[in-house]
Each structure stands twice: as structure tokens, then as C-alpha cells.
């Protein structure tokens, strides 16, 4: 009888512990679902709030990084080519596409020369990204590149049934050299980042060079993509910081910041099935934690409801929200949706500038002069919910100021979407197209 009582007592205690754990779990989830995790009244600056919120999302900032902005195609390719020419060990490239033009051919010549020296050169390109540009790499080009020592492969080849390959495209742009220098941002490999195009004029975009411990994160991202495509696991071959001798790279652009080698950075990587919410949660927290000013440039501002609400909520709590979009665009219908959204956001109190001289394909956000991001992510449903994307989040006032200065300069080449301007600027037919396009925004 006593044993039965003891067993009953133990059972009751176990049930009590389990119930307590369940209550704590539910309370924790309810707290996390409430939006910004730290009350604004806490007095913490927005960059501290962002770091706390992202940590709860599983994103951790590393210290000791150095970021250099590359604000033009010429800057990007000059810097990238100079670094690759000095590679000693490995060059890994992951792009949405390599356009079959002069800048790509120059890149491949440099890579082939490094391969001849014994440097391991691996490259990935997205099948849809390649086929959707007007100068794709053909099979004969891929064969020739492999014969020259460049180990290049296609991410997710498009095969029947084609509908299975619409989503989950690799839109990232990553280069890692010797495991010590990385490049990421919004630019693929194409002449038009330097020359522009007849259709849109100058093609503006943003890239950056990264040095420091966060390079390892980009290297790991490449390794996972490489294994997915080729089946080869190369993640243990000593391609990380500290696993190879420390090399010097000369002739690269200086970042002009007095915080060099002391920057806090986090890689925000969206992968279906692994981290599907990463980028949209970053943007949500970046906007929701703002206390003073948000400056945002994005080419395809078709938005999802969560980000749209975050922007209008920011205005309601007194944050100045400034958004820049481009008047020219490289695709149909999407810009109609963008301009429709801009009109709606302007009515809610956002300040909108429309950039006229060319296509501003830049994807950046700057908040409170304290933090920013540079990356591949468009603020559309495809980037935020479907594709592989990567952004570098940077907690640094110097880099944020450089991007803010660019924003202010570009205002001079933009017109302000004041009250009534939308109806003067867009014809009734264009406004109807915008309304219709916004209905399709989950698919744009």
C-alpha cells in the first residue's frame, strides 16, 4: 500500500513538472509572438533591440569584422578581380547568373588563370537565373569552362515538370576567397552594372566586401549549396578563418571607417526548409525597433502584409519613414504594383522619392543612423517567402552613414511623391494596372 502511495506521489510530481514546463513554454511563445521583444520604454537603442530580437530568431552578430561598401559596378568588379588575382588557396562563387558578356568572360579568364596555378575554383549559378537573362551561358560555354579548370555547376536544373522549379531559386550573390575575404550584395555578373542598358539607363546597385569571422558563415552557406548541387561535402577541408595562413591582399578599396575590424555583423540567410523566415523577420525587427528614422531603397516594393504593417506602424509611433524606388524598371507589371503601394504608403505618412536617371536596383535599409543591411533580398513575396537570399546586417554607424549619404545624394535626382502627385504622374490606365498588379503581389 505504501509503495502504491509513493508511486502515486511520484506520478503526481512528474505531472506537475510537465504541466509547469508546458505553461512556461506557452508563456514564452506568447511573449515572442507579441512583436518587438523588448519594450521601447526600456531605453535601449534600436541597434541593441535588433541584436536581442535577432538572437531570439537564432541570428547572432559576430565582432571583429570589416565591411567595405562597393557602390558601383566598376568598384565591385575592380575590387573583386584584384582580390581573385591574389587568391592562393580557393575561390568559391555563387550567383543567380553570369551573363555571357565581356565582364563575365574577363572573370572566367582570371579564374582559369588561378586554376592553372593550383587554386581550387568552384562556381554555382541558378538555372532559372541563367535562362531568364538575354545572354545566357550555353552548354558549350560550361564545357569550355570546366576544361579550363573551373568546376562550375547549375543550381536546380529546370526539367519536366517545369512547375516544380518555379520557386526556391538561388538568388544569392556570394564570393569567398581563401576563406578570408567575401563579397555579397545585389550585383550578379554582367556588363550593365557598369554600362547600363538602353531600356533603363544606368543600372544602380550595391555590393560589399567582408573580412573577419563572419566570412565563415558565407563559406558555410556556399558549402551547403555545393553539396545540394554536387553531392560533394567540402566543409571539412580547412577553408575557414584560422585554418589557412593569413594572407595580405593589396590594392583593394579602403572602407573609410574608423571602426575597421571592429564591426558587428550577422549574415541573414534565407533557405527554404532551413531558415524560411530569416529575411522577413530581420526586416520586420529592423523596422519595428526603429525609434527615429528609416531609410529604405528597394527595386521591387510589392511587399507582404507583415512588412507593410511594420512600415505604417513605424509612422504611427513617430518614426520618419523615407522610401526610394526607381521610375525605370527591367520587368513589366511589377513597377505598377510598386507605384500603387508607394501611393498607399504616402497616404499613411511615409515619404516617397522616385529615382529618375536609371534603375535603382539597390536593396538596402538604414535605421536611426545605427544599423543597415546590404544584400540580395527584394521586398516582394518571392524573395521573402520562396527563394534563397542572403543579406549582411551591419551594426555600424560609419557604414550606415555612408549609405545614408548616398540616399541623400540620390534625392537630388528623384522627385518627391507629394499629395496629388500620383494622379498627375500616372494615367488612369496606369493606375488601374497598379490596382490590378497589387492583387497579384503574392506571385510577383
Where are these regions (language model features)?
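Bacterial N-terminal signal peptides
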Residues: 16-26
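Charged, low-complexity intrinsically disordered terminal segments
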Residues: 5, 24, 28-444
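Bacterial N-terminal signal peptides that target proteins for export
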Residues: 5-16
Amino acid at each position: 500500500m505504501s509503495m502504491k502511495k509513493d508511486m502515486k506521489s511520484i506520478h503526481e510530481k512528474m505531472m506537475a513538472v510537465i504541466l509547469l514546463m508546458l505553461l512556461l513554454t506557452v508563456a514564452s511563445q506568447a511573449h515572442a509572438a507579441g512583436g518587438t521583444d523588448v519594450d521601447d520604454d526600456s531605453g535601449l537603442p534600436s541597434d541593441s533591440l535588433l541584436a536581442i530580437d535577432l538572437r531570439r530568431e537564432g541570428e547572432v552578430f559576430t565582432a571583429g569584422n570589416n565591411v567595405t561598401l562597393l557602390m558601383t559596378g566598376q568598384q565591385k568588379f575592380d575590387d573583386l578581380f584584384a582580390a581573385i588575382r591574389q587568391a592562393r588557396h580557393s575561390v568559391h562563387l555563387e550567383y543567380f547568373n553570369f551573363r555571357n558578356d565581356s565582364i563575365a568572360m574577363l572573370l572566367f579568364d582570371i579564374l582559369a588563370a588561378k586554376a592553372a596555378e593550383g587554386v581550387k575554383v568552384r562556381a554555382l549559378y541558378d538555372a532559372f537565373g541563367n535562362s531568364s537573362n538575354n545572354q545566357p551561358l550555353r552548354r558549350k560555354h560550361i564545357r569550355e569552362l570546366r576544361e579550363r579548370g573551373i568546376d562550375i555547376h547549375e543550381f536546380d536544373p529546370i526539367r519536366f515538370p517545369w512547375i516544380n522549379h518555379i520557386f526556391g531559386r538561388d538568388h544569392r550573390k556570394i564570393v569567398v576567397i581563401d576563406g578570408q575575404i567575401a563579397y555579397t550584395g545585389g550585383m550578379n555578373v554582367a556588363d550593365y552594372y557598369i554600362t547600363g542598358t538602353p531600356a533603363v539607363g544606368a543600372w544602380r546597385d550595391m555590393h560589399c566586401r567582408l573580412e573577419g569571422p563572419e566570412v565563415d558563415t558565407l563559406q558555410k552557406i556556399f558549402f551547403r549549396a555545393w553539396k545540394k548541387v554536387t553531392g560533394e561535402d567540402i566543409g571539412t577541408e580547412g577553408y575557414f578563418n584560422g585554418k589557412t595562413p593569413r594572407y595580405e591582399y593589396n590594392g583593394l578599396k579602403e572602407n573609410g571607417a574608423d571602426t575597421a575590424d571592429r564591426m558587428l555583423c550577422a549574415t541573414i540567410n534565407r533557405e527554404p526548409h532551413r531558415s524560411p523566415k530569416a529575411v522577413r523577420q530581420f526586416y520586420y525587427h529592423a523596422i519595428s525597433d526603429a525609434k527615429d528614422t528609416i531609410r529604405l531603397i528597394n527595386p521591387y516594393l510589392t511587399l507582404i502584409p507583415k512588412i507593410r504593417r511594420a512600415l505604417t506602424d513605424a509612422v504611427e509611433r513617430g518614426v520618419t519613414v523615407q522610401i526610394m524606388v526607381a521610375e525605370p524598371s527591367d520587368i513589366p507589371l511589377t513597377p505598377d504594383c510598386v507605384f500603387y503601394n508607394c501611393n498607399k504608403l504616402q497616404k499613411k505618412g511615409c515619404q516617397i522619392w522616385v529615382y529618375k536617371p536609371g534603375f535603382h536596383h539597390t536593396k538596402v535599409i538604414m535605421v536611426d543612423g545605427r544599423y543597415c543591411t546590404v544584400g540580395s533580398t527584394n521586398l516582394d513575396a518571392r524573395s521573402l517567402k520562396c527563394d534563397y537570399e542572403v543579406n549582411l546586417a551591419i551594426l555600424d554607424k560609419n557604414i550606415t552613414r555612408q549609405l545614408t549619404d548616398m540616399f541623400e545624394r540620390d534625392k537630388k535626382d528623384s522627385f518627391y511623391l507629394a499629395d496629388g502627385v500620383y494622379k498627375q504622374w500616372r494615367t488612369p490606365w496606369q493606375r488601374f494596372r497598379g490596382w490590378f498588379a497589387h492583387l497579384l503581389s503574392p506571385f510577383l
